[in-house]
């Protein structure tokens, strides 16, 4: 329950920085700090609301090490790839957790897995979507889940 309250607080705080969205977006000539903060800004209240709802859907998976990995991966991707349009929003973190949960959904709730995949495919067809960022973070989340599972099993086997 504590993660729910913390998640709601962070989502609420992100609403207050919507007016700063132009100074938080990542683009080829953006200042260095934007690479570390772009995932907290949103272009408008609709963008914020959709991302906030999606964050709430994954809040049960939030652990400090997972959030740190998602944030570091999103920062790394912002340094590697520069799209033509500015990138802004928490959707990169959401896609990390979508990738993180994909294996579980495929195994136990296959219909949710396919709904998630369909939603991703439709999302990539929309204009002004940073598709490369989303795909890369989805894959990194998937890899992180595999690595976390391997480490957990290795610890139980005393390897």
Each predicted region: which residue ranges?
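A detector for small-residue-rich transmembrane helices and their helix-helix packing motifs
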Residues: 1-159
């Amino acid at each position: 329950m504590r993660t729910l309250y913390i998640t709601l607080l962070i989502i609420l705080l992100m609403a207050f920085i919507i007016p700063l969205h132009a100074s938080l977006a990542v683009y080829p000539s953006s200042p260095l700090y934007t690479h570390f903060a772009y995932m907290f800004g949103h272009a408008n209240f609709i963008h914020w609301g959709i991302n906030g709802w999606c964050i709430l859907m994954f809040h049960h998976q939030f652990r400090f090490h997972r959030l740190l990995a998602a944030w570091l991966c999103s920062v790394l991707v912002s340094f590697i790839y520069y799209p033509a349009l500015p990138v802004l929003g928490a959707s990169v973190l959401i896609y990390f957790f979508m990738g993180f949960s994909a294996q579980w959904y495929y195994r136990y709730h296959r219909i949710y897995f396919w709904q998630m995949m369909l939603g991703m495919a439709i999302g990539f067809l929309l204009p002004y979507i940073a598709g490369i960022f989303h795909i890369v973070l989805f894959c990194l989340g998937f890899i992180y889940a595999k690595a976390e599972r391997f480490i957990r099993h290795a610890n139980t086997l005393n390897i």
